[in-house]
């Protein structure tokens, strides 16, 4: 099982993905050490150069760590993140050059938005050289898309995710944007395949006990609604 298949399996099992915009590399290692034992996947976002060194620091200490690179908006940045050893790449939109780099390296690519879901799936199949209908079977970790935003101040877009699963059977839809512990229970009614919870789980990175407490609260909500 390659890294992308492994992180995809982890997300499917536990659903929760925590997002960290690190101020230093120690935060990346610390966040991983808190979240990993709980089964929560860590996404380190590329909003500064620290992200790259932070990913490297985690993987230097924990070579088998499954880390996602977030806010990857160029092919060059995707190459860099993959060189550092990430298991998957996440973008805020469908960016063809990012997707192309990911498929070339057989790394999970999770574009996001409220459209383009079909375009990115078709392009993935073309790049892998397989029939569209076989993409889900051969590369299940590429049969994904991120619903962004899932919630705004005035609307929710869960119905779009349900509609996508009509033509794209078994599509794995990960929700992000506007999610909180307060509305998580309602969100779970639409059965998301993964939940990017923003900085909610990492904002207390300087207080490990508090961070773990918040993470466990989110997990308890998920388990209570799905079991």
Where are these regions (language model features)?
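Well-formed, non-transmembrane alpha-helical positions, independent of function
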Residues: 34, 57, 80, 101, ...
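Residues at the N-termini of beta-strands
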Residues: 41-42, 88, 144, 194
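Hydrophobic secondary-structure block in the mid-to-C-terminal portion of proteins
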Residues: 159-225
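Short acidic, S/G/P-rich loop/turn micro-motifs used as interaction or catalytic elements
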Residues: 25, 152, 203
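Short amphipathic alpha-helical patches
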Residues: 58, 65, 104-105, 125-126, ...
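Conserved N-terminal beta1-alpha1 strand-loop-helix module at the mouth
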Residues: 1-85, 170, 181-182, 206-227
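Conserved anion-binding
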Residues: 73-77, 84-184, 200
């Amino acid at each position: 099982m390659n890294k992308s298949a492994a992180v995809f399996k982890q997300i499917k099992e536990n659903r929760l993905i925590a997002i960290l915009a690190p101020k230093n590399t120690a935060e990346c290692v610390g966040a991983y050490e808190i979240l990993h034992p709980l089964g929560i996947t860590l996404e380190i976002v590329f909003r500064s150069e620290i992200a790259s060194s932070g990913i490297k620091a985690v993987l230097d200490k924990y070579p088998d760590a499954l880390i996602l690179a977030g806010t990857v908006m160029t092919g060059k940045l995707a190459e860099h993140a993959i060189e550092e050893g990430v298991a998957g790449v996440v973008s805020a939109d469908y960016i063809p050059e990012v997707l192309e780099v990911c498929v070339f390296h057989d790394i999970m690519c999770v574009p996001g938005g409220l459209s383009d879901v079909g375009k990115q799936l078709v392009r993935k199949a073309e790049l892998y050289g397989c029939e569209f209908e076989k993409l889900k079977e051969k590369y299940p970790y590429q049969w994904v898309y991120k619903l962004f935003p899932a919630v705004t101040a005035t609307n929710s877009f869960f119905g779009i995710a349900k509609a996508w699963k009509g033509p794209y059977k078994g599509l794995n839809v990960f929700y992000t944007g506007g999610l909180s512990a307060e509305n998580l229970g309602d969100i779970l009614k639409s059965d998301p395949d993964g939940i990017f919870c923003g900085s909610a789980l990492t904002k207390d990175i300087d207080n490990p006990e508090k961070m773990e407490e918040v993470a466990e609260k989110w997990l308890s909500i998920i388990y209570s609604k799905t079991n």
